[in-house]
Regions:
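Acidic, surface-exposed loops and disordered segments
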Residues: 1-204
Length: 204
């Protein structure tokens, strides 16, 4: 079994954390930077993050998350935010590609213009769906990177997103998707079963 397979199979949703264990800011930044290599629609990277390490702010967040103990006891909470107007960053993203030598100026300008024109006419609901899907891709990378470094995680989708958005003053184009708790398990996670492959896969 490869190291990647071991990490994938060992990742569990941990709900009980050691409140004394801390992960420093630099390591969280490293995890997020590597995770940002995740694919995204037109490479627009429609994800944003709010990282909460301050204990008082985590306690303030707890009621939004149905008083789940993991919020208060974990080392950090990463709030995954979607950006429905990520297409407005197309020019910046393609300019970076030129600077890094990934494409020439003319191609970059064409891509940036076409991307902006295509996405700017889409309904808000569709843009939000793109952002939510892409946020799922980078979230999985965060979970696996954390596990590879010996940390445990829990993804929480059931929280008061309206109050969260108000508390952290999210602009109208941004919306909360999930909270990810990171830390060190105080108690092992429950094992969970998976449906058999023939139940979920169809080959043609």
């Amino acid at each position: 079994m490869s190291q990647l397979e071991q990490v994938i199979k060992s990742r569990k949703s941990v709900r009980a954390y050691d409140p004394e264990f801390k992960i420093d800011k630099k390591e969280l930044e490293e995890i997020l930077e590597i995770a940002s290599s995740a694919p995204s629609s037109s490479n627009l990277q429609a994800w944003r993050f709010i990282v909460i390490q301050d204990q008082e702010k985590k306690k303030e967040l707890t009621p939004f998350g149905n008083n789940q103990a993991a919020i208060d006891a974990s080392s950090a909470i990463i709030a995954v935010i979607g950006d429905a107007e990520a297409y407005k960053n197309a020019q910046e993203i393609y300019a970076q590609n030129v600077e890094l030598g990934y494409m020439d100026q003319a191609i970059a300008e064409t891509y940036a213009t076409n991307t902006y024109n295509s996405y700017s006419t889409l309904p808000q609901q569709v843009l939000s769906q793109f952002a939510s899907y892409d946020a799922g891709l980078i979230s999985m990378q965060i979970l696996l990177l954390a596990k590879d470094r010996g940390y445990d995680t829990l993804v929480m989708g059931g929280f008061d997103k309206v109050d969260f958005a108000k508390r952290f003053e999210l602009p109208e184009n941004q919306f909360p998707i999930a909270l990810i708790a990171l830390g060190k398990a105080k108690a092992p996670a429950f094992n969970s079963s998976r449906l058999p492959l023939e139940k979920i896969v169809t080959f043609y």
